[in-house]
């Protein structure tokens, strides 16, 4: 869920 951290 890296997208949740904007990575």
From Swiss-Prot:
The keyword Secreted applies. Transmembrane segments: none annotated. The modification Leucine amide is found at residue 7. Keywords: Amidation, Neuropeptide, Secreted. One of its GO terms (biological process) is neuropeptide signaling pathway. The keyword Secreted applies. One of its GO terms (cellular component) is extracellular region. Its main location: secreted. It is found in: Secreted. This is Carcinustatin-2. It comes from Carcinus maenas (Common shore crab).
């Amino acid at each position: 869920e890296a997208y949740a951290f904007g990575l």
